[in-house]
Amino acid sequence: MIPQGHSPLGGSGAGRFLACPGSVSLSKGFVPEVEEDNSFSAPGTAAHEVAETALKKGGETWRLIGTKAENGIEIDKEIVDAAQVFVNAVKSEHDPATWEMGVNAFIEQKFHRPELHELFYGTADFVYVDTPARTLHVWDYKHGAGVLVEVKDNAQGKYYASGVLQELDLWGEIDNVVIHIVQPRGFHSSGPIREWSVSTEQLGNWLYDTLIPGMDKALVSRETKAGMHCRFCPVRWAACPALAKVMDEIEEMLKVAEEKGGVNKLTMTQAARFVSLMAIGKIAEKAAYEALHARAQKGQKIDRYGLKLVKADKHRIFRDGAEDAAVAEFGKKRAYETKLLSPAKIDGLPNGKKFTAEWAYKPEGGTRIVLADDNRVGVKREKASGVFKKEEK
């Protein structure tokens, strides 16, 4: 029997507990001062439900606008539009006419493989087995917009793929696995639909050499390591030794900068380290902000600390009935805006990728500095001395 709920060593946390095994032990029994804000996760759960319904029943997602998901969230146009990108992408890649449910097509495929590890269980959004090509396709829908999910070497994707191969007993039938991530609301340089391939041999090596030993270690280890994986760690609100060490080092770097006359006087090594530390420090700062905000909401005074509680900015919205009134006042043509879908949204349409391959392009943009483990391709710049020749007198 497959356990209910999320595994404490599930796929969504694999990237974190493999990097920081101590986060699992530190999280046990920890009750954060601030409750997780489900205003971000709840619409994603509803979008998953919309996509699941559309894939199972073959209908269009827009028909669900105005209904309520099981978690009580009202399904609106934004949720439907995002879910439809996922549905279109799946159908475009795998012709529904070829689907045999439970044979080569699986929606919300659950797995639990205690022979690998008691806590090895989860649910894959959509799975397609291409037997002639000896290829398994594992699809994962991401509703979030704030954190872009990279598909290359994605720990959650590999976790789910391993679980599905084991659950369906396909290790001997499949040579290659394609992991698909669809993130319609996040702006990614590769678009909202991304994929990455891995051989079953490589995946099996990762499963037995990295994942399972990592799961065992996470159950007993107190070893912590700070990184961008801290964004989703429950202990980011607690006394995490790794985050505390980062904050101490930031303080030391600020002292060095002061002695040198400013952060712009730091050496390349010092500046690079400072930027890396601050990227992680912002995670702790965000957790502190959320805790402070929760206290202020309950009436605790924060004025003495040079802060105050204010109303959040909101854009104006129309009251009920405004749509009909606007059409009557301005006419339908002037009241509504019609424009071409973005290349990212066109990608999700049938034959969309073929169209954008011909018609879409990336204009030249600026540059920015990111952490080294970011999957974007690095840009090389020559030193000025290597570009310009000395003027001959």
Give residue spans per PLM region.
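Short, charged, low-complexity amphipathic alpha-helix
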Residues: 178, 208-280, 377-393
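Mg2+/Mn2+-dependent nuclease catalytic core
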Residues: 99-217
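Active-site-proximal structural scaffolding
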Residues: 119, 153, 226, 271-277, ...
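Extended, charge-rich alpha-helical segments
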Residues: 283-393
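Short amphipathic alpha-helical coiled-coil/interface segments
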Residues: 79, 83, 87, 271-292
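Metal-dependent nuclease catalytic cores that hydrolyze phosphodiester bonds in DNA/RNA
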Residues: 1-138, 178, 189-192, 278
